[in-house]
Every structure is written in C-alpha cells, then in structure tokens.
Amino acid sequence: MNAALSQWKDAHAARLRDYSAVRVSGRVSAVRGILLECKIPAAKVGDLCEVSKADGSFLLAEIVGFTQECTLLSALGAPDGIQVGAPIRPLGIAHRIGVDDSLLGCVLDGFGRPLLGDCLGAFAGPDDRRETLPVIADALPPTQRPRITNALPTGVRAIDSAILLGEGQRVGLFAGAGCGKTTLMAELARNMGCDVIVFGLIGERGRELREFLDHELDETLRRRSVLVCATSDRSSMERARAAFTATAIAEAFRARGQKVLLLLDSLTRFARAQREIGIASGEPLGRGGLPPSVYTLLPRLVERAGMSENGSITALYTVLIEQDSMNDPVADEVRSLLDGHIVLSRKLAERGHYPAIDVSASISRILSNVTGREHQRANNRLRQLLAAYKQVEMLLRLGEYQAGADPVTDCAVQLNDDINEFLRQDLREPVPLQETLDGLLRLTSRLPE
C-alpha cells in the first residue's frame, strides 16, 4: 500500500513540476504548402501543436525550425481549412508512442493512430498514462550491439543457400514493379519464426493495401503483427513519419526481449516523401535531385534496427529500382548502409522463375558469421557456376558456343537447368535449412576441382 502511494505521489509530483498556469499559444501568419508560419515563445523543434481549422476541428503540426521572425511548423495532414490567424496550441510534447501487446493485430496510420482493429493505437497524446517512447530517436551506441551470430532461415532455397540471413541483420530487397516483391515479403514474415512482425507500408495504393491484408496475412500471422500504413494519398509528413513509427514500435518490442522482424516497404517512397518536405522547407537539391535531409535521415532510420542486449530487430527494407538499374541514388545510398541486399530480377520474373532472386547480384555481408566453411565453399562454387554461365549465355543463344575450352564453363552449361530448378520454389512450401544445404552440396559437388 505504501509503495503504491509513493509511486502515485512521485508520478503526480512530476506532473506538477511540469505544470504551468500560463498557456502559451500563437496564431498562423502564413501558409506555404505544408509549412505554417507563426510565433510561439519558448518553442522547441520536434514539439507537436494543435492548429484550429475553420470548421472547429484540429490539425496536428510539428515544429521543424525557426527564422528570426517566426516559428516554422510542418502540417501532419492536409492543411485544408487553415486560415491566417488560426489559433495554435502547443502540446508541449514530441511525437511519442505507447506500445503493449494490445497493438498486435492492429492496423495503424503513419502516426500510430488506429485504422483497423479494436485497439487504443500507439499515438500518445499529452494525457496518455502509458509508458511511452519517442518516435524520432537515436540508434543504440555501437558498443551496445552484440555480434550477429545466429542464422535466421527463411525457408526460401535461393536465400538460405547463397544469402543466409542472420538474426539482427538489416537487408535491402531491391526490386522493380511486378517482380513478386510483396509475395516474397509475406512469405518471409510467415517463415522466419520471429515473435513479432512489424510492417511499415509507405506510399502503397489503397487497393493493394486491402488486398495485402485480406490475402497475404492469415489469421495466425495477423495475431503477431502490427501494420503501420500511410497510403500514397496521405501527406508527405505522414508517409515519412510512418517509417519512424514502425521502427519505434519494433524497438519497443525488442526492449522487451523479443525477436522482431521489421518489414518496411519502401525506403524509396520514404525518400520521396522526405524530398517533398525538404523542398517545402527550402532545402537545396543535391545529388540525384534529393535534398540533404534524405541522406541524413536514411542512416538515422536504418541504424535503429539490429541486435541489442535484450532482443533483436531483423529488418528488411524494400527499394524500388527501374529497369533493373542499381544506379538510382536512393538504391546506391541504401546499398552502402545495409548489411546485405537481395535483388529481384525482372528477366527472371518474365521467364516465370519465382522467386525471381538474382543470386549472383545478391550478397550478405555477415554470411561468414552464420555459416560453416562447408556452406561457404558450396556457396562460392554456386556463384562460380552462375558467373561462368552468364559469360557464355549470349553465345549459347546464338548457337556459337563450343564446348571443351573451359571445364568450369562446360559444367555450368550442363548444370544450368538443375541450378534453376534448385533456385525455383513454390513459396507456400518452405524448405528446411538442412535440406537446402544438402541440395546445395549435391549440386556443387559436380563442379570439377
């Protein structure tokens, strides 16, 4: 009883210390796209404000900067109905979320408010009594990140044989439209055996989102998943913030000692949303037509995933590429930040080769941490066969290839159909890791020494 009373007293004492009888407010002086200008004394970057609309409703906005004359707010929704002179009430808090098991099975918007499901949502208002954490936060210090040593099988032969993932790894899934990206994501979520799955769906079409919910997520998967969605018609602030909201939710479950899978689709649309925000804020355009804030926020986002002393976040980030080109500025930047990448090939998809994973173009930087020497040697031999076949593929199509010049190339030509058969798979039928390894060893043992 005394302990409960003491806890109650400490909680209310903290509230009283923060309480002020003076209510600071401001008024809108200008509206420039998603940016609102006003004057608010003692404001801080990152604080949320409520802006009154003409119809009596409120719009959330976040303080993003200052000039000598005014405070700059970025509207967290469409600024329709905002008038010059509209009252602004600072909430005195940054964007925070509260996370507990009630979120499992819920669909949230980019800020953590419920869209579907009987739940309170994650968004924490000024009167929220839950334990909360900030959406925009720093990553764990490098000294607090354990080494990745545990393999995380996916049930997909093309991945487990050549790009075996590790618990806590951050991987990019590079794909063009129509390459089977969404289907592969859903199957990875189903097969990877994580305690909690957090989906961040950014800039998707509304129709595709509904189809994903109805057809890709069965009831078992839904019960251990949280979905954060910001469709393409939502504001640029919501689309960009959805990535951070999903990451913060994953961090909360990791802090509870759970093994979390974070699936973020896509970093390209996140970068496009941040580009809109940067241009509206007056940032200059830099490399690839992107403002500096994009290159600042990408590492700040992806570095928050990974291992901790308590749990792990294994993160899969999709990146949209055009015409199978990896030279897109976002793709190039993301590839340098992550621990590996999986490339889906349009050419393979057009041949009906699914999953359309281009093994020779995909890589895992921590493969040696989670595989033995036998597996590594077989993986190298598989890549050697694929590279040898690619060198003579055009000659084979023209009928100009002559056998006998190189035994490795001859073997690659003979084994090509067997290799493709090994890499093809019905994703609804996951393959155990040991079975995949046995098949890989049998296949590559036919390569001459």
Curated annotation (Swiss-Prot):
Pfam families named in the record: ATP-synt_ab (PF00006), ATP-synt_ab_N (PF02874), T3SS_ATPase_C (PF18269)
Residue sites binding ATP per the record: 178-183
Coiled-coil annotated residue ranges, if any: none
Catalysed transformations (reactions): ATP + H2O + cellular proteinSide 1 = ADP + phosphate + cellular proteinSide 2
Enzyme Commission number(s): 7.4.2.8
Gene Ontology CC annotations of this record: cytoplasm; type III protein secretion system complex
An example Gene Ontology molecular-function term: ATP hydrolysis activity
Chief location bin: cytoplasm
Regulation acting on activity, per entry: Oligomerization increases ATPase activity.
Gene3D superfamilies given in the database record: 3.40.50.12240
Enzyme class: translocase
Subcellular location: Cytoplasm
InterPro entries associated with the record: AAA+_ATPase (IPR003593), ATPase_a/bsu_AS (IPR020003), ATPase_alpha/beta_chains (IPR050053), ATPase_F1/V1/A1_a/bsu_N (IPR004100), ATPase_F1/V1/A1_a/bsu_nucl-bd (IPR000194), ATPase_T3SS_FliI/YscN (IPR005714), P-loop_NTPase (IPR027417), T3SS_ATPase_C (IPR040627)
One BP term from GO: protein secretion by the type III secretion system
Disulfide bridges in this chain: none
Protein keywords: ATP-binding, Cytoplasm, Nucleotide-binding, Protein transport, Translocase, Transport, Virulence
Function description: ATPase component of the type III secretion system (T3SS), also called injectisome, which is used to inject bacterial effector proteins into eukaryotic host cells. Acts as a molecular motor to provide the energy that is required for the export of proteins. Required for type III secretion apparatus (T3SA) formation, proper protein secretion, host cell invasion and virulence. May play a critical role in T3SS substrate recognition, disassembly of the effector/chaperone complex and unfolding of the effector in an ATP-dependent manner prior to secretion.
Subunit structure: The core secretion machinery of the T3SS is composed of approximately 20 different proteins, including cytoplasmic components, a base, an export apparatus and a needle. This subunit is part of the cytosolic complex. Forms homododecamers. Comprises two hexameric rings that are probably stacked face-to-face by the association of their C-terminal domains. Also present as monomer and homohexamer in solution.
Family membership: Belongs to the ATPase alpha/beta chains family. T3SS ATPase subfamily.
Protein name: Type 3 secretion system ATPase
Organism: Pseudomonas savastanoi pv. phaseolicola
